[in-house]
Structure formats: C-alpha cells, structure tokens
C-alpha cells in the first residue's frame, strides 16, 4: 500500500507543509481566500522555475541569469513565510479536531460519490447514450469539469451539512468551469502550435525563447489574478493529476477498443480497486491530509474519472487518429510517427543524450513518467492487453494511414531510407537507440507491451508515483527542450553513438561489419528531410554504393543457378541490403564444388590452352626467371618442398632402401635433429611408410598407409628433435585442432589433422594425404606462364575461405605462399597447410623477418603492428604468381622489397611510416625513402634518397603479357587486376577485407 503513496509528498519542503496546513483549515471553514489560490499558483510557478533552471544547468546559463533566479526564489520564499504566519495567526483550531472533522467528512463523501458514479455508469451502459465522436469529446470536457467542480467544492466545504451559500458558489463555479475549460483548452492548443512553429523558424535563438517564456509567464500571472483563477488552478491540477490524459495519449498509440467492452472492464476494475482499499490507507491518508489536498481524495477521484473516461477515450482516439495525419509535413518530420500534443509527448533533448553514463542512468530512471506510467499500467492490468490478432490488425491500419505521409516526405533519393525505416519499425526495436529516439512510436512493439525486463519492472513503480504537479512541469519543459533540440540534429547524431549499447549482440550473422550496422541504423534513425547536411550526403553515397554491389550480386545470381537468390525486398530481412557473409560463403563453396565436378580431368588441358595463347616472344624472359628460382627456394621453409632430391639429402642417406644401409638402424636422428626416414618401416605400429615427400625447416614428411584404417593413405609429418622445434610442433598441433573443430564439415580449406603420436622422441602429426603443393604445380604445368584464369579464380575462392576460418579462430598463418598450399590429385581442391609459423592475433611480436620474404607485407618490414592483413597481402602475391608464373616482388632484401612495392603502389603514406619501429632503416628524418643498392662495379652499398616514388609497374600489362585473350577471359583478367590492386594496398587499414574480397566481381562472376 505504501508504494502507491506518491514520493512527491515526501520530497516537498517544510514550508509547503505549513502552507498546506493553512489551506486545509480554510477548506474546513468553507472559505477559500483569494491569496490562498494565488499562493498555490505562485508555488506552482516557483516549482516550474526550479525545473527549468535544472535543465538550463546543462545549457551553461550566464551568472546573471542564475542570480536573477536565486533572487526570485528567495522573494517567493519570504512572501510565503509571511502569508503562512498571518494565516496561522488567524486560525485558532486545534490540529487534532481539524483532522477528525475533515477526514470523517471526506470518507462519507467518497462513499456517496462511489455509489453515484456506479449508478451513472450503469445508466450509461444501459442506455448507450453517446453516439457522435465530437459530442463525446465535448461531453468529456463538460462532465470532467462538472465532477471537478463538485468534488473540489465538497472537499472544500468539509461537511455535507454546510451552508447553502457554498453550494450556490459550487454551481456558479461549475458553469464557470465549463466555459473557461473549453476556452482555455482551445487557446492553449493554439498557443502551443504557434509557439512550436515559431521556435522551429528561429532555430538556435535561445534568447528569443527565453523572452517568450517570460512573456507567457507574465500572462499566466495576470490570469491568476482574474476571478476565474480558482477554477483555473483546479483545471491545471486536473490536467496533471488525472491519468485520463496520460491514458489518452496511450490510447492514441494503442488500439481502438469497443466502448461496450471498455465499460464492462472499467466496472470490473473499479470493483477490484474498491475492494483493495483498506482502513489502513485511510488512517495514513488522514495524517497526510494536513500536508496536501488529501491524496486519497485525489487518487479516488482519478480512479473514478479513469474508469468513466475509458469509454469516451476509445471513440475519441479514433477521431484523434483521423485528425492527426492532416498536420503539416514539417511537423510530421519533426515529430515522427507519434503525433501527440507537445505537452504530452515525452521527447528527449540531445543534451540528455550526451550526459555522463551515471547521470544518464539517473535521468533515465526519473525521466518520462508518462511512458513508464503507461508501461507499468499495461503490465499490471490484464484487461488492457489486446489479442495479438486485433493488435496486428490495428497496427496495419495505422501503417496504411501513415504510408502516404512518408511518401510525401521522402524525395526520390531518400526512398530507400523509408523502406529501411519501415523495416526497423517492423523489427520490433532491433536497435537500442530506437528506445530513446523521439521519432519512434513507443508502445508499438507487442513485445514491449507484453513484458518488461525485470530491471524496468522494478523501476517503474518509482517512476510512476511522482507528484502530479512536477510531472506536468517536467512535461512542459521537456517539450520546450525538444523544440530547441531540432536545431541540433548533427549533435544528436554524434552523441547518440555514446549511448549505443549492443542490445542484440550476436544476433547478426558472424562477420557482419559493425560499421555497416551503425550506418544502416544510426544514420537512418531520425533524419530531418529539410536539412541537407553532411550526414545526408554520406548516407546517399552509401546507398548508391550498395546499389552497385546489388547490381553485381544479381549479375552473379543470373549465372549462378546452383545458389538460391536472397530475398530482394528490403522488408523481408532486418539486415543491410548487401548479402550476408554466410550467404556469400555458401555461394563461394557451391562454386568451388561445381568447379571440382566440371574440371576433374581438364586441368592439364586448360594449362595447355593457356600455353597456346602465349607468343614465341615469351622465351627470352624465361632466363631471368631461372636465375631467381634458386633464391626463392633457399628461403623455402616448407614442409613439402619439392627439393628433396638434393645432394645434401642423398649424402644423409635419406630415401635409400632399408637393407642398403643397416648402420642407420640404431641412429634415428641426424646431426640437425631430422628423423632418418626408412622406406618400409612402421610408425606407431600402424603407419607403413612407402614414400618420402620432402623436408622443411621444422620437419620432414613421409607418405604412409594406415594399417588400422584399411590401408588408407596418410601424410606423416615428423618434427625435428630439438627443443625449439618440438615447441613449434606442439603450437601447430594446437592451432590445427582449433581450426578443425571450428570447421567440422571441412568447408574452409585448411588441412585436416587426423591424430598425433611420438616416435623415437619425435612428435609426429598425421594428416590427410594430398598430392603436391602449388609450387610443384607451377613448376610442372605453368612454368613462366602460370595457370588458367578459371583455376586461379577457384583457387582464390578457396584461399579466401581459408582466411575466413583463420580470422574466426583469431589465428594468423604468417607464412602463406604457393609452397604451403597443397592440392588434390585432380588439382581442383586446395588446402592451406604448415601452421608452424602461425600465431594468435594478439601475440604478434614485431619482427622484420616474419613470413617468407617475397610474400612479406610492408607493415612487417617497417616494424608496424600487424593483423589479418599480412595474410591477405601474401594471398595477393600468391594469386599474381599463380596466374603469371612469376614472383610479384622478388626482392633481395627488405629494403628492396619496399622499393618494389612502392614501384607498384607509389610512396608509402607518412602516417604509416611514422608508426614503424624499423622506419629509420629505410627512411630518413624527412620520411624520404633511402634505397640501398649494391654498385655493380665497385660492389659497395650506395644509398639513393627518393623523396617521391611514382608507380611505374603496370599490373595489367604484366597479367596479360603477350596473351591473345578472348573477351570473356580478358574481362576476368581486368577483374583480377582490380582485386589485386585492392589487396596490395600499402596501408593495411585500406586493404580489402575478407568479406569484401569474397563479394568481389572476380570471385562472384563466373566465366
């Protein structure tokens, strides 16, 4: 019961208490003095000032203003104290007697009123007397004012047995009230609309606003001296106290109900509430009646009025709905879909949004009593919830009614935005910002209506029970702030990002970019159509870009029969217009499968076809390539290097038959820690070694058959027996397990690890069998020529999928090159292997020699922090090599590597150079590149300072070379050139992302 007691009663200052006690005495004697109502009014005004100054606090008001406020406040306080003292001198009654008389009369009153109201309700129910909507509204105003007049009169007179003069005065007041209420409500609404339009015209003119506020204040003060001031103050009290207005605003947003249903429900509700009342409450209210105009009285009045006004509202809301859409477009733009009167709509100023988190939390708790009152009531009264069917129906009606306005508002360019707005609304407040933006309809989503989060539920009773007067004031000041806030659209958008919290974290498909989300939600949130600002331009450009992406997507879909097209209507999904990463992955995977089916035996034929396209002139370029090859392979720390027939290996006796060299039986490990492999031996009692594949920095690899698995072929990688290599081997084992667990269906083209074991103190890893690596493929089929564009496209798709999996597992491979990419027998499927250099993305130690040199990204060379971009760079270099058969950057040193990269892309950005730890090795103090080369004659190092480096290497010419390409292939080569340009950006921040690469035309469009 204590929860229903408004905390405002507790919060009011002491002098208010004294003031109120004086008033209750006057009420008992049936005399309501002029200065009392004036007093009441001035108190009301004082509070209002207080509230405004609270808001102005955020607006950095000047010292003069503050002093003025202070003086004003003190003047009122002094005035009040004097009045209170005078009044208390006049009165001589003991407080105890006063209370008893007052409260007995009140209780008696209330009982009789309840009986009267019930009878009235029953009569109305029987007769169903009210028909027309306008009549209803008028009647609502009349009956409301009548009740108010009567009830206040009774409360003031104390007993029913008081003199006749008081009743006549009551009648006069009733008529007075009727007229004044009508006139005042009309004039006020007019004033408000005029006020609002004025303020919109003079955006940012705060001084003007202040003057207006002062003017309106003085007017009200003048009014308070007029004879009808008593009825006015009553009317104001009614406005703030009765929940009917609050309910009406709720009804506007809510659904129209049948009046009959409404009456029955209201009766039931009335009964329940009456039953709940207990003597304890009355006891408590008795004590409180000294301090305020008996809150029990007010509460009961409001309850009765609430039940009576329900049936009026149901029809009234219909009429309001009809009227509202006829507002001016500008008004619509500002108020969004929620067309309420300004005093009633809880808006949020941008200032509120940019509060500190703590303040924001507090203000959120205390803010919008209306909204929360409505929420708490909805959750508490089951009678108020509609069936989902009816709710949906009325919602669709509402939407139809709103559609023409939206069309009128949106210019042709902003139409996609409207679609998305519609979609956002349908997605039931998918973005957390929706909750706070004034342009959103608040009680639209059925989810919110049905249930509230426990936090909000626990908070709402506190918010609900706020003093009616303060509620009224806060509502007014909020509307004032909202009007001002329109001039600060830009600020609102900037500050909104601070409030943002990811409510639906993980609901989007993985890999979806955060930037895309925020741009589709944030920028489209509440967009002023009139303002053509920076945000609008950016937004339109984004939409145009998306349209281009869509165009490519549909082109791809036309040729891609195997993949079902994504629903194209923007309303069908809450995602951004571009296809989701998962859809892209599916499409690419399907492409790879199709390529595998179609090209089982065509690999060699396609390579020969490419050879035939080349002209005879090519031969003179091959000698240079041969010179580079040894350098390339000395760098090779590959587990499958096709180099195992070297003199060193033969000298070590590796690969010889077991019987030929029986001395090796006891000596399993050579001087460098490599395992001495013997053909025919059995490892771990099950793997029968039948062939030797090769040797890398960390290990050597053998082919074997698994006796335990029906002689299934496997590859066994035997790690070198030394501490560092063992450590590296265990790390690789960990990463492989992680990758395999993340890809149970083997869609992402990373090598599968079957198991591991130890053999003669060597860690052995058992892999799926694959025939050769891409270095061998290039050597065998595409020496100096490269592979067919079809094969390169398929390989690039598979490599990007592998990168996608690595990123999901937060792993950097850090050694991608043709040597570490294995292919199957038909050369259609590839797998990324050798995770010996891999690391977790967070453990990226800065070292200038990470990754094989030709595939090393510039950020590694200059010692800048790096991430997934280094693997993307390596893939770019590999793709170029696969198509041309030539190494893209065959640098002899890191310095030479930088020079070659800048020959292709121009000078490295200064911003990037400054971040490099090793920048001084390659750049001088003015950030000019120092090219270090060896003089051919003197064989001494010479340094050439290059302030500007212009791109001289033509990628397209290198890709096409001397080929006479048919049109379809030429188009694909142009696309490959475009993709490589984006992959090989010197600044990793500007480099293409994996998702973008998967959406690139080269990947998406078939040949």
From Swiss-Prot:
The modification N6-acetyllysine is found at residues 100, 717. InterPro entries: Kinase-like_dom_sf, Prot_kinase_dom, Ser/Thr_kinase_AS, Ser_Thr_dual-spec_kinase, STKc_PRP4. It is an enzyme of class 2 (transferase). The modification Phosphoserine is found at residues 8, 21, 24, 33, 88, 94, 132, 143, 145, 167, 240, 242, 258, 278, 292, 294, 328, 354, 356, 366, 368, 387, 427, 431, 437, 518-520, 565, 569, 576, 578, 580, 852. Residues 1-104, 141-535, 560-583 are annotated as: Disordered. SUPFAM superfamilies: Protein kinase-like (PK-like). Residues 518-535 have a biased composition (Acidic residues). Belongs to the protein kinase superfamily. CMGC Ser/Thr protein kinase family. This is Serine/threonine-protein kinase PRP4 homolog. It comes from Rattus norvegicus. The gene is Prp4k.
């Amino acid at each position: 019961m204590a929860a229903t007691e408004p905390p405002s009663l507790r919060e009011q200052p002491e002098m208010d208490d004294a003031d109120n006690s004086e008033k209750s005495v006057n009420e008992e004697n049936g005399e309501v003095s002029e200065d009392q109502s004036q007093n009441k009014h001035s108190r009301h005004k004082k509070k209002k000032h207080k509230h405004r100054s609270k808001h102005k606090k955020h607006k950095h008001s000047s010292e003069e203003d503050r002093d003025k406020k202070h003086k004003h406040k003190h003047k009122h306080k002094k005035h009040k104290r004097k009045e209170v003292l005078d009044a208390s001198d006049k009165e001589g009654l003991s407080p105890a007697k006063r209370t008893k008389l007052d409260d007995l009369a009140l209780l008696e009153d209330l009982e009789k009123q309840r009986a009267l109201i019930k009878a009235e309700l029953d009569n109305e129910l029987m007769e169903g007397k009210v028909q027309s909507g306008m009549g209803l509204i008028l009647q609502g105003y009349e009956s409301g004012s009548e009740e108010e007049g009567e009830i206040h009169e009774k409360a003031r007179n104390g007993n029913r047995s008081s003199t006749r003069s008081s009743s006549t005065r009551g009648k006069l007041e009733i008529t007075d009230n009727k007229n004044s209420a009508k006139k005042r409500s009309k004039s006020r609404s007019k004033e408000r609309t005029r006020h609002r339009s004025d303020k919109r015209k003079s955006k940012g003119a705060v001084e003007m606003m202040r003057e207006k506020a002062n003017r309106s204040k003085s007017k009200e003060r003048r009014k308070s001296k007029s004879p009808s001031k008593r009825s006015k103050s009553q009317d104001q009290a009614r406005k703030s106290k009765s929940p009917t207005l609050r309910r009406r605003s709720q009804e506007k947003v809510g659904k129209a109900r049948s009046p009959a249903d409404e009456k029955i429900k209201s009766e039931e509700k009335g009964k329940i509430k009456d039953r709940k009342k207990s003597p304890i409450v009355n006891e408590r209210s008795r004590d409180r009646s000294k301090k305020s105009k008996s809150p029990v009285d007010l509460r009961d009045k409001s309850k009765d009025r609430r039940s009576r006004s329900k049936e009026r509202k149901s029809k009234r809301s219909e009429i309001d709905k009809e009227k509202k859409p006829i507002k001016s477009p500008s008004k619509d733009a500002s108020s969004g879909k929620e067309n309420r009167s300004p005093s009633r709509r809880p808006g949020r100023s941008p200032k509120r949004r940019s509060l500190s988190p703590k303040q924001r939390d507090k203000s959120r708790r205390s803010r919008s009593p209306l909204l929360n009152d409505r929420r708490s009531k909805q959750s508490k009264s089951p009678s108020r919830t509609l069936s989902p069917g009816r709710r949906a129906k009325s919602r669709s009606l509402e939407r139809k009614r709103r559609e023409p306005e939206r069309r009128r508002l949106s210019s042709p360019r902003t139409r996609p935005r409207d679609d998305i707005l519609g979609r956002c609304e349908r997605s039931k407040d998918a973005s957390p910002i929706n909750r706070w933006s004034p342009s959103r309809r608040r009680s639209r989503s059925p989810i919110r209506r049905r249930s509230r989060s426990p936090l909000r539920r626990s908070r709402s009773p506190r918010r609900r029970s706020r003093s009616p007067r303060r509620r009224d004031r806060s509502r007014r000041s909020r509307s004032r702030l909202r009007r001002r806030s329109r001039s600060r659209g830009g600020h609102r958008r900037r500050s909104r990002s601070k409030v943002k919290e990811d409510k639906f974290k993980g609901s989007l498909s993985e890999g979806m970019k955060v930037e895309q989300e925020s741009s589709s939600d944030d920028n489209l949130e509440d967009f002023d159509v009139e303002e053509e600002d920076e945000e609008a331009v950016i937004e339109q450009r984004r939409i145009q870009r998306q349209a281009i992406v869509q165009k490519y997507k549909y082109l791809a879909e036309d040729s891609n029969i195997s993949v079902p097209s994504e629903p194209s209507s923007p309303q069908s999904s809450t995602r951004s217009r571009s296809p989701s990463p998962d859809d892209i992955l599916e499409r690419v995977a399907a492409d790879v499968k199709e390529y595998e089916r179609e090209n089982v035996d065509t690999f060699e034929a396609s390579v020969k076809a490419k050879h035939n396209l080349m002209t005879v002139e090519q031969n003179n370029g091959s000698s240079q390539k041969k010179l580079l090859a040894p350098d390339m392979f000395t760098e090779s720390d590959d587990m499958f290097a096709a180099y195992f027939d070297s003199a060193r290996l033969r000298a070590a006796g590796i690969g010889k038959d077991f019987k030929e060299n029986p001395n090796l039986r006891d000596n399993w490990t050579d001087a460098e820690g490599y395992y001495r492999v013997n053909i025919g031996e059995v490892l771990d009692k099950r793997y029968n070694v039948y062939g030797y594949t090769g040797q890398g920095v960390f290990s050597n690899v053998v082919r074997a058959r698994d006796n335990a698995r029906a002689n299934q072929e496997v590859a066994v990688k035997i790690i070198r027996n030394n501490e560092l290599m063992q450590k590296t081997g265990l790390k690789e084992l960990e990463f492989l397990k992680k990758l395999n667990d993340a890809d149970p269906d083997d869609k992402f083209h990373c090598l599968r690890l079957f198991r591991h074991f130890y053999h003669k103190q060597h860690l052995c890893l058992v892999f799926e069998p694959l025939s050769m690596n891409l270095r061998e493929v290039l050597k065998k089929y595409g020496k100096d020529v490269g592979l067919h564009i079809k094969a390169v496209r398929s390989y690039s798709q598979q490599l990007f999928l592998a990168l996608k999996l690595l990123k999901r597992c937060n792993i950097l491979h850090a050694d991608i090159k043709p040597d570490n990419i294995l292919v199957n027998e038909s050369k259609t499927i590839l797998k990324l292997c050798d995770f010996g250099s891999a690391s977790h993305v967070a453990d990226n130690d800065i070292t200038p020699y990470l990754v094989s040199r030709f595939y090393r990204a510039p950020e590694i060379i200059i010692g800048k922090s790096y991430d997934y971009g280094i693997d993307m760079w390596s893939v770019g270099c590999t793709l170029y090599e696969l198509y041309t058969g030539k190494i893209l950057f065959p640098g002899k040193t890191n310095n030479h590597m930088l020079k070659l990269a800048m020959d292709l892309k121009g000078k490295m950005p200064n911003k990037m150079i400054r971040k490099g730890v090793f920048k001084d090795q390659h750049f001088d103090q003015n950030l000019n590149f120092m090219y270090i080369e060896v003089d051919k004659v003197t064989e001494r190092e010479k340094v050439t300072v290059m302030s500007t480096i212009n791109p001289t290497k033509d990628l397209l010419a290198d890709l096409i070379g001397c080929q006479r390409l048919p049109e379809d292939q030429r188009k694909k080569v142009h696309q490959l050139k475009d993709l490589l340009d984006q992959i090989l950006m010197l600044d990793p921040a500007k480099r293409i992302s994996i998702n973008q690469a998967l959406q690139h035309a080269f990947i998406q469009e078939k040949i």
